[in-house]
Amino acid sequence: MLKPSEAQDRADALISQAKKAGADAADAIYVCDAATQVQMRLGNLEDVERSEGEEIGLRVFVGKRSATVSSSDMDPQTLSDLVGRALDMAKEAPEDQYAGLAPEELLLKTEPHAIEGDDGQDPDPEILRELALKAEDAARAVKGVTNSEGGGASAGRSIVALATSHGFSGAYSTSGYSLSASVIAGEGDGMERDYAYDSVRFLEDLDAAEEIGKEAGERAVSRLNPVSFKSGAMPVVYDPRVGNSLLGHFIGAISGSAIARKTSFLLDALDSQVFDSSLSIIDCPHRKRGLRSKAFDGEGLPTAKTKLIDNGRLTQWIMESASARQLGLQPTGHASRGVGGAPGVSVTNLHMGNGSVSKADLIKDIKHGVYITELIGMGVNPVTGDYSRGAGGFLITDGEIGPPISEITIAGNLKDMFKSLIAADDLEYRYAGNVPTLRTDSMTVAGG
């Protein structure tokens, strides 16, 4: 695997070739990955995989025409041919008045913000095997667990380098580790499954394997013997593990491309109250050891902490250069791209801030409601905000979380749901997107 500086040199060299060959502008992205995965099942080693690969993508512009090509072959002649092919394709492509590199004056010109995202380790597969085994053993030890889908552990490192023809060049490395267990409880038609996992940048931050396994087992057992209940309009409470999916719907609705195409249910919501005034949503690209931390975006713009929702108010769209030009605005440092195609947009370490009440207080006045721990399917209309998803979880009666429920449907409209959300004070930073326990009183629930 290359060092970040070597990866940066490789991207720079490809840009130089493209300019010499006649490109008016160009950008290149180099990505190298190496990963080891170990899977255990019923105490036995089921699978060990080691993967390594590198790829480079080149985007060239000839006037307002552009083309993107990529290669996993780093042979100099292959890359030279790649440049020629890209230029030939660009000359035949239709013009796009919004295409182009990011505005030069917005590029990151200073030393990138230090991102603590790589611990430099490459653990032996035996270490991963032991972690996976401990997680599965702990899950299987929970009373009521009858079978296992396995325990898994993985370790990986990535190098990313980006260069543009108008002055940006940068690279960074990240490491990543994950540990999971998935088990089955019960017998016959009454079987239920569940899982637990942890994903971190530094190996030393990984949750104890025994705790992950225990959580998986207890979650599976807690789902046994689901009950039926009366359908209707009622409060819905989202567990943080599934509540963060609401962040995804929100981000999709404020992306520049969705706004430019007029395909967002928040099309007219800029500078207006979208959530309750007690809530804020913040993107933190420089969080130490954050799962998506980065110092620059996919176009070479600096990243920065951003309050997308400030006391309930929508402050901005998230835009790469093309959609920003279409909207007559400036890109926001949220461009994201791979080796193929033009940049899209994405956020980094996103979270919704804490509320002011405990989880117990959040649900104590609910006479009849549901606590959701699982979501199934993707029945969400991004244009209207209509929301209907399969779900599972637990019944709430008289302020207490009670027996499990399964195969239910929860439905509403995201605009109404967002405005009615109330947050507990139990936020934890476990995923790329994090929320506290959330409650909305604007939904209808159909029982299974």
At which residue positions do the language-model features occur?
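Active-site bordering "gate/hinge" segments
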Residues: 1-294, 298-301, 310-313, 398-400, ...
